[in-house]
A protein has these predicted regions:
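Hydrophobic helical membrane-anchoring modules
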Residues: 112-141
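Conserved core of the sugar-phosphate nucleotidyltransferase
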Residues: 1-6, 14, 20-116
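Short, well-ordered alpha-helices that flank and scaffold nucleotide-derived cofactor binding pockets
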Residues: 8, 35, 134-138
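Conserved residues at beta->alpha junctions
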Residues: 19-20, 123
Length: 141
């Protein structure tokens, strides 16, 4: 694929992917995280956010709450959800395994970088674009 051809040509041990579809990301914060990763010993990292909701596995078993619990979507248990704002990984691992990281704890599980939900409006559809336009106009005024 084009991505793997490109990775073969890149002269770097690590790759950082940036999601250009999130226009409200704080540039200074992005740079701070990139600088942290470059100085760290972690082999991979990914931006995430906390998602509070009711989640079940494919067998319809609750995964973040006990049956009959009274839960709130604003103050209950949460799961980490990837935002893909920044994805940082070892180039050789991607080329050898065709994945960013193995998703197994400490083999090497990616470091999770918690991101503020206010910056994470992701523009993938026309509706998303209209939402971003509205938020942008509110911020500007």
């Amino acid at each position: 694929s084009i991505m793997y051809d490109h990775l073969n040509a890149v002269d770097s041990d690590y790759i950082i992917n940036y999601n250009p579809c999130q226009p409200f990301l704080n540039v200074d914060k992005l740079q701070k995280v990139i600088n942290w990763f470059k100085a760290s010993t972690h082999q991979s990292a990914i931006t995430v956010k906390q998602e509070r909701n009711f989640f079940w596995d494919n067998k319809k078993i609750p995964i973040n709450f006990k049956p009959n619990d009274r839960l709130s979507t604003v103050s209950g248990p949460y799961l980490w959800v990837a935002t893909h704002s920044l994805v940082m990984y070892k180039r050789s691992y991607m080329l050898e395994n065709w994945e960013l990281f193995p998703n197994l704890y400490n083999e090497p599980f990616p470091y999770l970088v918690d991101w503020d939900d206010k910056e994470l409006i992701d523009v993938d559809t026309e509706v998303d674009f209209k939402l971003v336009k509205t938020v942008y106009n509110e911020i500007r005024n």
